[in-house]
């Protein structure tokens, strides 16, 4: 399980150093093999350990290529999926096209989201957090049943 938000730097080659607290579990779970793709709804990237990504691929394979919306999701997620291998120094090379898509520069936020990470440009991340808090404070929408049952 991945949690927390950590600022990491991309080096000049587009590599990010995975925080040490995640390296051991990633090596155990996936031998450091990861898959990175775009997020369909946010200006960030999604980074999955390979076994978790394979579950996503199975779900995508069950979608109909004859349904335009389903094919679009397949095309976007699979078409942008890029495998990356954690090297001996715990670094992952993020493909240039993916970095460009998410507007990633030097400072990047690695955000744990249960079974995956999100990769955000640092400034975009902080703006998104502010926007999310503002939306929560001003929303008039009733909470879903799942959120009503969530006790923090």
Swiss-Prot record:
Domain named SpoVT-AbrB is located at 5-52, 81-124
**Gene that this sequence comes from:** mraZ
Transcription recorded as keyword: yes
Q: Which UniProt keywords apply?
A: Cytoplasm, DNA-binding, Repeat, Repressor, Transcription, Transcription regulation
The Gene Ontology biological process terms listed for this entry are: negative regulation of DNA-templated transcription initiation
Its recorded name reads: Transcriptional regulator MraZ
Q: Name one GO cellular component term.
A: nucleoid
Location relative to the cell: Cytoplasm, Nucleoid
Q: Name one GO molecular function term.
A: transcription cis-regulatory region binding
Cross-referenced CDD domains:
MraZ_C (cd16321), MraZ_N (cd16320)
Provide the function of this protein. Answer: Negatively regulates its own expression and that of the subsequent genes in the proximal part of the division and cell wall (dcw) gene cluster. Acts by binding directly to DNA. May also regulate the expression of genes outside the dcw cluster.
How this chain assembles, per its entry, is: Forms oligomers.
Family affiliation: Belongs to the MraZ family.
Q: What is its main location?
A: cytoplasm
């Amino acid at each position: 399980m991945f949690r927390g938000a950590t600022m990491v730097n991309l080096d000049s080659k587009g590599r990010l150093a995975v925080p040490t607290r995640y390296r051991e579990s990633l090596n155990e779970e996936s031998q450091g093999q990861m898959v990175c793709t775009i997020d369909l709804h946010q200006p960030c990237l999604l980074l999955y350990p390979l076994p978790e990504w394979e579950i996503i691929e199975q779900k995508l394979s069950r979608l109909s290529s004859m349904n335009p919306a389903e094919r679009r999701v397949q095309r976007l997620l699979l078409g942008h999926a890029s495998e990356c291998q954690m090297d001996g120094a715990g670094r992952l090379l993020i493909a240039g096209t993916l970095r460009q898509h998410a507007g990633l520069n030097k400072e990047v936020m690695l955000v744990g989201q249960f079974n995956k990470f999100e990769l955000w440009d640092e400034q975009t991340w902080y703006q998104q957090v502010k926007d999310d808090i503002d939306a929560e404070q001003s929303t008039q929408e009733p909470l879903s049943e799942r959120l009503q049952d969530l006790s923090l």
